[in-house]
Amino acid sequence: MEKELIVTDVVVIGAGPAGMTAALYASRANLKTHMIEKGVPGGEVNNTADVENYPGFSLVSGPELAQHMYQGAMRFDAVHDYGDVSHIEVAGDLKRVHTSSKVYEAKAVIVATGSFHRHLGVPGEEELAGRGVSYCAVCDGFFFRDKEIIVVGGGDSAVEEAHYLTQFASKVTVIHRRDELRAQKVLQDRAFANPKIEFIWDSVVEEILGTDAVEGVQIKNVKTGQTSRVDAQGVFIYVGLVPNSEAVKDLGITDQEGWIITDDHMATSLPGVFAAGDVRQKHLRQIVTATGDGGTAGFQAYQYIETLKD
């Protein structure tokens, strides 16, 4: 089947905070802008219960913030298309972005595809996904009312979601491979003060146990080598992120782990190809840093296209 051809100025891939802000800035610069997203606009923001560190809001739910961003992104006539980008071709000044049914020809491309939660890679994880194993407390927490839950990880996401889950669970046990948390102090203090949260230190999950549903986990102490079982009906996993950069893997713009390498202007080594948000090689991945990236990328795409007129 021949694909539909769409000619545009800028293609933004992804509709998370970075992508929506990039679309806002590009379309506001009077560029014909198409924003492609395979899921619900907002990305991981939709999976966040409460956002308390985004300027302009003392407290806002993730989905509500995403809706505000989407309205802004569409304000200057950007086009929102649903689709899953398979690959990108770069031929000089022309870029071709492919989905299953369309080909977009653009002068500039902004990759804002974000990241997803890393899996543990242990027995039982894939088999029990959706049957007690989860990566989204906001999505699935309600199903564990009055049950015991394990949260794996020690960073911001793990600690924040552990606290969130206590409104449903009878007990939340945080299992962390180190002897101290990596989360921000305000999140640590909140977790340590919560009587429903317990901690198991210096331990890793070796297996998720259960036949038809999660029944617990087998853990190993990394210092002593001792193994033990912890009973629970749910396991929520927050052990880092993986870049969602499959569509650009052949372009030579990523590091060995798949994060896209850019300069401070969000430009990659390919002229006219930019990246923004969590898919970038960067230190801090937050909503506010993603929107900053997106604004910069949208503006720099405009600047780049202006140079093509010379």
Tell me the role of every PLM-derived stretch.
Residues 2-76, 147, 159-185, 200:
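Beta1-alpha1 glycine-rich phosphate/pyrophosphate-binding loop at the start
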